[in-house]
Swiss-Prot record:
Annotated protein name in UniProt: Protein ecdysoneless homolog
Sequence similarity: Belongs to the ECD family.
Keywords: Cytoplasm, Nucleus, Transcription, Transcription regulation
Region (Disordered): 445-464
Compartments reported by the entry: Cytoplasm; Nucleus
One Pfam family this sequence matches: SGT1
Primary localisation category: cytoplasm
GO aspect biological process, one term: mRNA cis splicing, via spliceosome
Species for this entry: Schizosaccharomyces pombe (strain 972 / ATCC 24843) (Fission yeast)
Biased composition (Acidic residues): 455-464
A GO-annotated cellular component: cytosol
Keyword DNA-binding: no
Superkingdom of source: Eukaryota
A molecular function GO annotation: snRNP binding
């Protein structure tokens, strides 16, 4: 277990929990110091055994499980903080490890929280008793003897209050030591077991890809496989200053390149593969961008840059020291050593899911979860089955290409991504349908579409005051009657008086010549507005009097395409937001 330094207690006591960070408290029910120390040693040894036996191939997304034995407020215990990064599965893998270790050490009580608080209760929100929720669950949720338990208040208290207050750390430790009111819910534990049933097999999920990288990187990864995540994160969160290191590549230069298999996790591979970047100066990529060599070279370039950024980062001095220590261990792998590594490319089709397919996959997953939950309910919530049931290899571990080249995958993806004439017509049709649907919405409750009956006293008095001021300012001016329905009809061109009139008859005047009398009705106001708006549009679009529907569609698509091309990131900005809301996927290739 890693040492967290002398400030572990200060960080644990802090109310601020960083994003993607989980905190762990492990207390023991023994009252004698010698017995507690023995239980601590046994618990840490069991965690180490579990990781060696079940997670030997696991690659941590950010930090590995960090725990430290401390004496806190006169009580020997284990405290820990781990930042699991972007991989939520790492957090649940930690939960699985702690749950399994608690089975071996019966006196252990484990608490784990993150920025959401008691996230174990969030997972089992539908199964909680009425007297506990997220507001009063502090220090009440623990893992003990392989089960999630809740520190329950006294029955007399619940009869009076119907819900329990949150606990302090001291109160929770006292109740743990006494062993009283430990509430266990089969439904809560079933929900947690459902979430954990894919472990430990899911902990060893990996994705292998062929990359062209410096020989030094192969050597470093052979010494510590978890440095792959540090390098990918360094490239993924790079800034313009970091990219200056990539233009020099002083540590991982491109003079000694090898093509070999690199092991990622699916998440790390997706983060690296989908990162967009320029071709940095030290790199000479193949000219054929659709070739297999280009794919391997561009992936290797990104990984090499990640290691270069990691090595030069002032925030990761310990990583620099670690890399230097590995590189001092000679010799580097020879060409014969590299040839012994089998060239394997795992399936990456999981990244080629369009939005429509994603909804279908999520629905299938939800239905599968509901079926599993129903089976468990009918079987009496057999927790033993949950603990020992693992997700099949074919579900969790990406399979091999089976001889299929990356070129075929690239061609298939580009066929999905390129826009053609029918795609453009479909896009225009969806936008037109959306506008027509919005324009024809007659199901309104009032002018603003909402009822404003629930206004407070201050708002009412303010409104009355405004009305009085308005009336005083407009004394002597005739009241203008406002017909809301007629106003909407005028906006939509449905008013019989003007529906068949040619708009051209209003185009002769300009803004300076308009004279709206004080007693004008709403129709005259609308005529004046039409005249002003039409005159401005006519002057701006003088050469487009003969525009037809096809020209409108063409102009619409022209503006959309120009907006896409002007946006450096196709997955952000107003055009992308508009098209995504209409379920129109933007191609990666312009």
């Amino acid at each position: 277990m890693s040492n967290l330094g002398n400030n572990i207690t200060e960080r644990i006591e802090s109310d601020c929990i960083s994003q993607n960070e989980c905190r762990i408290d492990v207390y023991f029910s023994e009252k004698e110091k010698e017995s507690t120390e023995a239980s601590i040693n046994m618990f840490l040894a069991e965690l180490e055994r579990l990781q060696l036996e079940y997670g030997k191939e696991h690659i941590w997304q950010n930090e590995e499980l960090n725990l430290q034995r401390v004496e806190y407020q006169g009580k020997d215990c284990i405290l820990g903080i781990t930042n699991f990064g972007d991989c939520i599965d790492d957090e649940w893998y930690i939960v699985w490890l702690l749950r399994e270790a608690s089975k071996a050490v019966k006196s252990a009580f484990v608490r784990i929280i993150d920025e959401d608080g008691e996230f174990l209760l969030i997972e089992a929100a539908l199964s909680l008793p009425k007297w506990i929720d997220e507001d009063n669950s502090d220090y009440r949720v623990w893992i003990h003897n392989g089960e999630v338990i809740i520190l329950r208040p006294e029955d007399e208290f619940l009869k009076k209050m119907n819900r329990c207050p949150p606990l302090t750390r001291e109160q929770a430790i006292f109740q743990i030591s006494s062993g009283s009111n430990l509430y266990t819910s089969r439904e809560v534990n079933d929900s947690i077991s459902q979430r954990l049933k894919k472990f430990p097999k899911a902990a060893n999920v990996k994705l292998r890809a062929i990359c062209t990288v410096p020989r030094k990187i192969v050597h470093v990864l052979q010494k510590n496989k978890n440095l792959i995540s540090s390098a990918v994160n360094a490239f993924y969160y790079r800034d313009p200053i970091d990219e200056n290191y990539c233009d020099r590549m002083s540590k991982f230069n491109q003079n000694d390149l090898v093509t070999t298999t690199i092991t990622f996790t699916p998440l790390l591979y997706a983060q690296l593969y989908q990162q967009r970047c320029k071709t940095f100066r030290p790199f000479h990529l193949p000219s054929d961008v659709h070739s297999l060599d280009y794919e391997r070279a561009i992936l290797g370039m990104k990984l090499s840059c990640g290691f270069e950024i990691l090595y030069n980062s002032k925030e990761n001095v310990e990583k620099r020291t670690e890399i230097d220590e590995y590189l001092q261990i000679q010799p580097l792998p020879t060409d014969e050593d590299i040839k012994k590594i089998p060239l394997i490319e795992d399936d990456t089709s999981f990244m080629n899911v369009n939005p429509d397919e994603l909804e279908e996959l999520l629905e299938k997953k939800l239905n599968s979860f509901c079926d599993d939950f129903g089976d468990d309910e009918r079987s009496g919530f057999d927790n033993t089955d949950h603990d020992n049931t693992l997700v099949g290899e074919e579900e969790m571990v990406p399979g091999n290409h089976g001889g299929k080249s990356i070129n075929e995958e690239i061609t298939k993806n580009k066929q999905k991504q390129n826009f053609n004439e029918s795609d453009l017509k479909n896009m225009a049709s969806r936008i037109e349908t959306f506008i027509n649907d919005e324009a024809s919405n007659n199901h309104r409750e009032d002018f603003y579409g909402v009822k404003n009956s629930d206004t407070d006293t201050d708002s009412d008095s303010l409104a009355d005051s405004d009305d009085e001021i308005f009336l005083n300012r407009n004394q002597g001016i005739d009241e203008v009657e406002f017909d809301e329905t007629k106003f909407y009809d005028l906006l939509k061109g449905k008013d019989g008086k003007y529906q068949n009139q040619d708009v051209d008859e209003f185009s002769s005047g300009n803004e300076d010549e308009m004279d709206i009398p004080g007693d004008a009705n709403m129709e005259e106001y609308m005529r004046a507005m039409d005249e002003e708006l039409y005159g401005g549009l006519r002057g701006r679009d003088e050469g487009l009097e003969g525009i037809d529907d096809k020209d409108i569609d063409l102009n619409l698509m022209k503006n959309i395409i120009e907006g896409i091309e002007a946006n450096p990131d196709l997955y952000g900005g107003p055009i992308s937001t508009l098209l995504n809301s209409l379920k129109i996927q933007i191609p990666r290739e312009k």
